Amino acid sequence: MAHKKGGGSSKNGRDSNSQRLGVKRFGGESVLAGNILVRQRGTKFRPGNNVGLGKDHTLFALVTGKVKFEMVTKLKMQVSVYPE
């Protein structure tokens, strides 16, 4: 017979790593070509002038310049980069 009761195992105690999504460069900031502007799931922000869209929907600058966030419609926002 067991001298002590079996220690129960907890079913909690796990968590996933954060995905670190969100805006990385804000409006008016200067960026270099290739800088990541927004990390997102789906196209919450759409690519505008001089902005590329990665396969995971990441927006990145195609040219060096200043970031501008623009409303396309009431619901859609696009991110553009204008050369200085």
Swiss-Prot record:
GO cellular component: cytosolic large ribosomal subunit
One function term, GO molecular function aspect: structural constituent of ribosome
Keywords of this entry: Ribonucleoprotein, Ribosomal protein
UniProt xrefs under Pfam families: Ribosomal_L27
Region span, Disordered: 1-24
A single BP term in Gene Ontology: translation
PANTHER family per UniProt: LARGE RIBOSOMAL SUBUNIT PROTEIN BL27M, RIBOSOMAL PROTEIN L27
Similarity comment text for this entry: Belongs to the bacterial ribosomal protein bL27 family.
NCBIfam families on file: L27
Name of this protein: Large ribosomal subunit protein bL27
